[in-house]
Amino acid sequence: MSDGATAVARPRPGVRAWPLYVGGFLGPYASTMVTPMVHEVAVGLRTTPEVAAAAVTTYMFPFAAVMLVSGTLAERWGRARTMQLSLIAFVVACACCVLAPTIEWFLAARALQGVTNAFTTPLLVAAITDLVPRAGLGRALGFFAGMQAAGQAASPLVSGPSAVLDWRLAFAFPALVAVVLAVLPPTMTAGPRPTGPPPVRALLNRNLALACALSFLCYFAAVGLTVLAILRAEEDFGLGPWQRGVLAAGFGVAGLLAAPLLGRRLDALGPWRTGVLMNLLLAVGLVVAALGPSVLLLGLGVAAVGVAVTGLRTTVNAIAATSTDGNRAGAASLALSFQFFGGALAPLVWVPLHAAAGGLGFAATALAPLVGVGLAAREWLSRSGPR
C-alpha cells in the first residue's frame, strides 16, 4: 500500500484510534472461547458436554437481542460513557464466569458477557465510520474485520492451552484486554454530536435491510462451519484437541491475513460487487470443507470461509454504518444483531442436519451464501444501470 493510500485509511489527526481496532477483537473472541474447552467446563461444573456447549448460544442470543437497540441507546446516552461502562461490566462478567459454582451460574455469566459486548462492538464500527475519511473507509473497516478475525483465531489458541491447566484461566485474557480499553478509551466521535434523541425511523431503509439480511446469512453459514468442521475433523480424520484447535484457528488467521487486501477491494469495487464475490467464495469454501476427502482440503475450506467472512463483515459494516447518518451506531448494531442471530441459530439447524445426512448436511450450509449472492447481485446490477 502506498503512503498516500495508508494516510487515507487512517482516522483524522488528534484522535486515539488504536483502541477502536483492539476492541474489535473482544466480541468474536468471547463468543467462541468456550468451544475448545467444552469438555473441561463440563467436568469442572459437573455437567455434560452438550449442556456446557450451550455457553455459545447463551452468549450469542443476548448479544444479538440487545444489539437490536444498543446502538440507538448508546447514541442517546453518549458513546464514550456507554463504551467505558460496558467494558467495566464485561470484566465483571468474566469474573462471574471464573467464580461460577454451577453450570447455571456459568451460563448466566456468559449471557452477561453477551449483553455487555452488545454495547461495544457496534459503537466501534460507528466511531470508525465517523473518524475515517470516506475514501479510505473500506481499508479501515477491513482492518477492523481483521482484528475480529484475530479474535476468532486467538480464541482456540488461548482457551485450549488454558484448559490444560484450568479452564477458568481462559477468562483472564479477555478481561485484561477490556481493562486496558477502559483505562485508555478510544476517541468515539469526530466532533460534537447532534442534540436530541437519535432518529429511529431513519433505520427503516433499504440499504440497512439488505445489510441485515447479508449479515444473517453470512454467520448462519459460517458458525455452522466452525462447529461442523471440528466434528468432521474428529469423526472422519481422528484429529486430537491441539490439531482441532489449529484447524479452528486457521479460520481467523486466514481472515486476518486477507483483511488489508479485502478492504482495498471494497474501496475499489464497492460493497455490492464485493458482496457477490465474497458470498461465492463462502459457498465454495463450505462445500470444500464438507466434502473434501483429506484434512488438507478441510483446512483449505475452513481458510476460504475465514477469508470470505472477513470480507463480508467489512462489506456489511460499510453498508450499514453509511446507511443512516444520524444514527450510525443504531444502524451498525442492528446489522450486527442479525449477524449473531444467524450465528446463534446455526448449531440448532446444521448439527441435526449433519447428524442425519453426514457430508451432504454439512454441504447444505452453502445454501445460505447462495441466497446472499442473489441479494447482492440484484442490488449491484440495479445500481450499475444499462450498459
Predicted features along the sequence, with ranges:
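Conserved MFS/SLC helix-loop-helix module at the cytosolic interface between two early adjacent transmembrane helices
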Residues: 64-101, 266
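C-terminal membrane-cytosol helix-exit motif in multi-pass small-molecule transporters
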Residues: 175-194, 375-380
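C-terminal transmembrane helical hairpin of 12-TM major facilitator-type secondary transporters
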Residues: 272-316
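A late C-terminal transmembrane helix in Major Facilitator Superfamily
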Residues: 323-357
